[in-house]
Amino acid sequence: MSKRQSAKYKLDRRMGENIWGRPKSPVNRREYGPGQHGQRRKGKMSDFGIQLRAKQKLKGYYGDITEKQFKKNYIEASRMKGDTGQNLIGLLERRLDAVVYRAKFTPTIFSARQLVSHGHVYVNGVKCNIASRLVKPGDEITLGKKAQEMALVAEAQSLPERDLPEYLAVDGTKATYVRVPTLDEVPYPVKMEPNLVVEFYSR
């Protein structure tokens, strides 16, 4: 198991949930935190603890993006019209690495980020290596010729546990971003609570 895979599954164990819905997640066998004392960590959490956990889970789901980036998204969401929590989800789902993952071009959000950073992803025909770039409705996301032949792309497209969301139109290795989704439309394997993230940052 690679170091990145180990870190990913460590997050699953810490949360006690199968964050990405992967069959090989260790929490499918046990539902407690990592380490020899993981089973002892249950108990009533404070409001702060609940809010922090919600933030860690949402941030971790998107490849454990940095706190700086995540808070920047929150601040932008809070300045937009409408519900801040819904706005935050919309911004996260507009990230280029998230779109590559949602389109089933890669099996994990981590490999999606790597594919982007290595210059294998194009937005409207122009190469883009910025994983945090926000796409907009109507944008077309495609893979370069070299990426189209990668085994991980074929693996991702064959994964039965992941469905294509309705806010993406996907044809092979081409995806069109149709619209910004609401929380209910995003196919999270676990419950996400952006309202608690808003409460965390509003303290």
UniProtKB/Swiss-Prot annotation:
A GO molecular function held by the record: structural constituent of ribosome
CDD domains, A to Z: S4
Gene it is expressed from: rpsD
Keywords on record: Ribonucleoprotein, Ribosomal protein, RNA-binding, rRNA-binding
Region called Disordered, residue ranges: 1-46
Entry-linked Pfam families: Ribosomal_S4 (PF00163), S4 (PF01479)
Record protein name field: Small ribosomal subunit protein uS4
Family of the protein in this entry: Belongs to the universal ribosomal protein uS4 family.
Highest taxon above the source species: Bacteria
Gene Ontology CC: one annotated term: small ribosomal subunit
InterPro entries linked: Ribosomal_uS4, Ribosomal_uS4_bac-type, Ribosomal_uS4_CS, Ribosomal_uS4_N, S4_RNA-bd, S4_RNA-bd_sf
